[in-house]
């Protein structure tokens, strides 16, 4: 409304905002990473259908597994609310994007299960409970990278806390 970016989200790996003005359209587009990597609008049914078609294309050619990058960022806050003040400047991709993301993961899982394929997700969230939320119920990711474990000191007591936190 004021002619600037829709919110204060920051891009990862860069001091730049996660919004870039497209000169031709006069509109901003979202990229949680590089400006050359625009985010897809997973709220758009045509985008979802196209992405499912991509999966089916590769499955028909014998691919039986996929690695999904930054899957915790698929769904976005429909309000595009600002990051809280205490998180301003941190990459927006560090937030958990919530229900829309989990709904999309369930739809992808159904498609892959029907075809006998699987998906491992890169979920760069920094707590085990949030990471585990992408696995619970057996209807989202088949496997997920455990990034919280990468940041855990190599001490038995800390690992116990990390593992028990994934209940």
Which residue stretches match the model-derived regions?
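Acidic/aromatic-lined carbohydrate-recognition and catalytic surfaces
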Residues: 1-56, 60, 72-126
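Hydrophobic residues within beta-strands of alpha/beta enzymes
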Residues: 66-68
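Conserved alpha/beta catalytic core and glycan-binding cleft of carbohydrate-active enzymes
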Residues: 1-9, 105-167
